Amino acid sequence: MTYRKTDEEVSKLTPEQYRVTQQNGTERPFTGEYTDNKRPGIYVDIVSGEPLFASADKFDSGCGWPSFTKPIVPANVNELRDNSHGMIRTEVRSAHGDSHLGHVFPDGPQDRGGLRYCINSAALRFIPREEMEAEGYGGYFNQVEDI
């Protein structure tokens, strides 16, 4: 499968999805569609469709945004230094879609690598396990579990 950002896909974004992914915005905490999602499946870039995170790596951090311990395909996630808002953080962007996803912090579960990928729901599209094969993501079944 080829993943890329197209003008057509960008034009389909809601105003909030555009603000978050194309203008480096952040959702208000506890407002995102996937914050409390516990269904098995994968999360892909809303623009390019590239696989980003799996339900098996999602955890409740209490921060108000979906949190994951690691990307499903590390090469699909770029990490960049972010000096905005008077802080030094690590921004997370999709590699093919160049969408702003959120940030990664070193305060995740220690027994699962110690990282917390804090991701905006507006940057994601959830593919339920039962639809993964039909949508072309069947190769990721081994990274999805009931949570």
UniProtKB/Swiss-Prot annotation:
It catalyses: L-methionyl-[protein] + [thioredoxin]-disulfide + H2O = L-methionyl-(R)-S-oxide-[protein] + [thioredoxin]-dithiol. Keywords: Oxidoreductase, Plasmid. GO terms for molecular function: peptide-methionine (R)-S-oxide reductase activity. It holds the Pfam family SelR. The active site is at C118. Its EC number is 1.8.4.12. It is an enzyme of class 1 (oxidoreductase). Residues 6-129 form the MsrB domain. InterPro entries: Met_Sox_Rdtase_MsrB (IPR028427), Met_Sox_Rdtase_MsrB_dom (IPR002579), Mss4-like_sf (IPR011057). PROSITE patterns: MSRB (PS51790). GO terms for cellular component: cytoplasm. GO terms for biological process: protein repair; response to oxidative stress. Belongs to the MsrB Met sulfoxide reductase family. NCBIfam families: peptide-methionine (R)-S-oxide reductase MsrB. This is Peptide methionine sulfoxide reductase MsrB 2.
